[in-house]
């Protein structure tokens, strides 16, 4: 494959950005800290492709970190947005589009009987934690090592995503009193969760988790794990919360809870439901959601919540996803991609394990299986950094971190998958010891 060697404009722009923004970026993982080198600066995106400011084209497997499941700048989405923007960018008042997207979410997601729109996944998780505590009258919450629920103080305990990428223990500026009620357990370890419940009787408001971990790499639940959490929370009068910001509408139309047949009490959403615009949502049983203001006493608000542009993009995206055969195609191309990646590594004598669920995939450069964050950390991060550079040179844009899942879209064709597997084969050959 043709090598990309010219990053002159990207380097100039990023150099200037470092004087203007912390680390030169608006979100830490974009800075390429864990893979080395300087980040490329994007100019435009379309379908499965991204172009940098130097004119280089890449096959993109980040998809704006998950929202672009229909492909970048899908014509039906952009046309709908062009029509909507003529009516205004934000109302700060109720609009009919909120009703329509709410109905679509409620119809699709098994746990959701009522929904509140916010502006990000972090906001959704912050609000849902407050709601968990208010509904149960309990302060403690259980999360899992490596699971990421946004950058709110109470969740920055053994968190994944950028915290894992940068090797940070947690974050300075978070008082111990803020996280004192946040308990942690290894993912896929039911016994550890049972122990926390026994040590904290009648004190745990609930358990929150990514049903498929995507912010500590790609880790799937062991058989019986989600079912076991459902039983434990019910037995202890606690709530079960699925953070489906990443998995919602990506691994099936009804998310992970539909895919695995386990229904939580509350769900957080984001990414896909905004079609590429800033959005978040949380929802669940009516008796719980009725506690949210103004119906109830649990306060939460947002200036741009439910704005017409995000609602428009979300509605059109979900309409596209609901078409026949959508998830069959995503299953097919993504499983073929990860099988090709694994085969390429094995052909070159490189330890690897990985997998996929519909339009979400990931791999670790280590012997497997990987069932939790501790095992994920055995991944060869240095080798991944070399792989990332080789793939970038060959026009393949992977997440610049070994602790992030990858994403496919409806715009990725067999041709893009073939080229990507070829690039992996060449890159593994280039970095093998």
UniProtKB/Swiss-Prot annotation:
SUPFAM superfamilies: PLP-dependent transferases. The keyword Isomerase applies. One of its GO terms (cellular component) is cytoplasm. Pathway: Porphyrin-containing compound metabolism; protoporphyrin-IX biosynthesis; 5-aminolevulinate from L-glutamyl-tRNA(Glu): step 2/2; Porphyrin-containing compound metabolism; chlorophyll biosynthesis. It catalyses: (S)-4-amino-5-oxopentanoate = 5-aminolevulinate. Its EC number is 5.4.3.8. Its cofactor is pyridoxal 5'-phosphate. It is found in: Cytoplasm. The modification N6-(pyridoxal phosphate)lysine is found at residue 271. GO terms for biological process: chlorophyll biosynthetic process; protoporphyrinogen IX biosynthetic process. Pfam families: Aminotran_3. Keywords: Chlorophyll biosynthesis, Cytoplasm, Isomerase, Porphyrin biosynthesis, Pyridoxal phosphate. CDD domains: OAT_like. GO terms for molecular function: glutamate-1-semialdehyde 2,1-aminomutase activity; pyridoxal phosphate binding; transaminase activity. Belongs to the class-III pyridoxal-phosphate-dependent aminotransferase family. HemL subfamily. Homodimer. PANTHER family: GLUTAMATE-1-SEMIALDEHYDE 2,1-AMINOMUTASE, GLUTAMATE-1-SEMIALDEHYDE 2,1-AMINOMUTASE 1, CHLOROPLASTIC-RELATED. This is Glutamate-1-semialdehyde 2,1-aminomutase. The gene is hemL.
């Amino acid at each position: 494959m043709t090598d990309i060697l010219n990053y002159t404009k990207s380097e100039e722009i990023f150099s200037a950005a470092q004087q203007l923004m912390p680390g030169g970026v608006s979100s830490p993982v974009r800075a390429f800290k864990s893979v080395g080198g300087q980040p490329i600066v994007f100019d435009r995106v379309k379908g499965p492709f991204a172009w940098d400011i130097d004119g280089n084209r890449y096959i993109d497997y980040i998809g704006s970190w998950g929202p672009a499941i229909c492909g970048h700048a899908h014509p039906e989405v952009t046309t709908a947005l062009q029509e909507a923007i003529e009516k205004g960018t934000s109302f700060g008042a109720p609009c009919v589009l909120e009703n329509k997207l709410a109905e679509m979410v409620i119809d699709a997601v098994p746990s959701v009987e009522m929904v509140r729109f916010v502006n990000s996944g972090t906001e959704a998780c912050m609000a849902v934690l407050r709601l968990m505590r208010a509904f149960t009258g309990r302060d403690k919450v259980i999360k899992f090592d490596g699971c990421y629920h946004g950058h709110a103080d109470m969740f920055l305990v053994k968190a994944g995503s950028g915290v894992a990428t940068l090797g940070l223990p947690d974050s300075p500026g978070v008082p111990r009193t803020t996280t004192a009620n946040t308990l942690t357990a290894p993912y896929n370890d039911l016994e550890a969760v049972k122990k926390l419940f026994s040590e904290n009787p009648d004190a745990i408001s609930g358990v929150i988790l990514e049903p498929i971990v995507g912010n500590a790499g790609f880790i799937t639940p062991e058989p019986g794990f989600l079912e076991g959490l459902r039983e434990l929370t019910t037995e202890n009068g606690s709530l079960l919360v699925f953070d489906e910001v990443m998995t919602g509408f990506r691994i099936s139309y009804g998310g992970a809870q539909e895919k695995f047949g386990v229904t939580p009490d509350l769900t957080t959403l984001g990414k896909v439901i905004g079609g590429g615009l800033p959005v978040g949502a949380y929802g669940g049983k009516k008796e719980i959601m009725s506690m949210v203001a103004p119906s109830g006493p649990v306060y939460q608000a947002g200036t741009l919540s439910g704005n017409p542009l995000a609602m428009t993009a979300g509605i059109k995206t979900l309409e596209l996803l609901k078409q026949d055969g959508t998830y069959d195609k995503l299953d097919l191309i993504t499983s073929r991609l990860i099988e090709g990646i694994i085969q390429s590594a094995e052909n070159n004598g490189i330890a690897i394990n990985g997998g996929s669920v519909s339009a979400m995939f990931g791999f670790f450069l280590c012997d497997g299986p990987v069932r939790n964050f501790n095992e994920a950390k055995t991944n060869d991060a240095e080798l991944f950094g070399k792989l990332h550079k080789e793939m970038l040179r060959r026009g393949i844009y992977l997440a610049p971190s070994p602790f992030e899942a990858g994403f496919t879209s409806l715009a990725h064709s067999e041709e893009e998958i073939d080229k990507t597997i070829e690039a992996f084969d060449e890159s593994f050959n280039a970095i093998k010891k």
